[in-house]
Amino acid sequence: MASGDDSPIFEDDESPLCSLEKMTDLVAVWDVALSDGVHKIEFEHGTTSGKRVVYVDGKEEIRREWMFKLVGKETFFVGAAKTKATINIDAISGFAYEYTLEIDGKSLKKYMENRSKTTNTWVLHLDGEELRVVLEKDTMDVWCNGQRMETAGEFVDDGTETHFSVGNHDCYIKAVSSGKRREGIIHTLIVDNREIPELTQ
C-alpha cells in the first residue's frame, strides 16, 4: 500500500466497477490538477507477475510485463503541456511497497503547494456546463476546460484586465495591486459583470 504525503487517493464509489475488474493489480490512484484540467493517474503493480501499468485519464500510457526488479520508477507525461511525471516504487518491508508520485521533479505535495502560488483557479456553471478556468500568473495564459484561451490584455486605471470569451459570455480577469508586499497582485474573474469566487485548493 502507499504511504507518505504523496500517497494516492484510493478508488471511490463513483468509479465504474468494470475498471476495477480490469485492473486487478491496482495499487495507487492520484488526482493531479494541471492548467488543462484534473488528471487521474492509476498505477498497477503486479508483485508476483512483475507487471507495471500506468493509466492517465483511463488511457494506458505504459505497460511492462515480467519486470524482475520490483522497485524502481516509471516516467511518463501528463496533460496538454506534457508535464513530466514519475512514479517511484520503493520497498518498505518484506513484500510491502510504497508508491509516490513526482510531478516536474517535485513530490506531488510540493508541486501542488508551488502551483497554488503560481496559478488561480475558478469553477463556475455557465449554460448548464461546469467550467474550470485557470490563470497561470507567470505567463498570464488562461485555460478553460483544457483549452488555452485567446486573450486580449488591457491596461485600466487600477491595474490590468485580461479579456476572453466563453461561448456568448464576456469574461475577464482583473489584476490589481493589494497594496501589501506579501500579498502582491490580486486576480479576480468577472463573467458577465459578475465576480466569481476563487477555488481554494
From Swiss-Prot:
It is found in: Cytoplasm. Keywords: Apoptosis, Cytoplasm. Transmembrane segments: none annotated. One of its GO terms (biological process) is positive regulation of neurogenesis. Its main location: cytoplasm. One of its GO terms (cellular component) is cytoplasm. Plays a role as an inducible effector molecule that mediates Fas resistance produced by surface Ig engagement in B cells. Belongs to the FAIM1 family. This is Fas apoptotic inhibitory molecule 1.
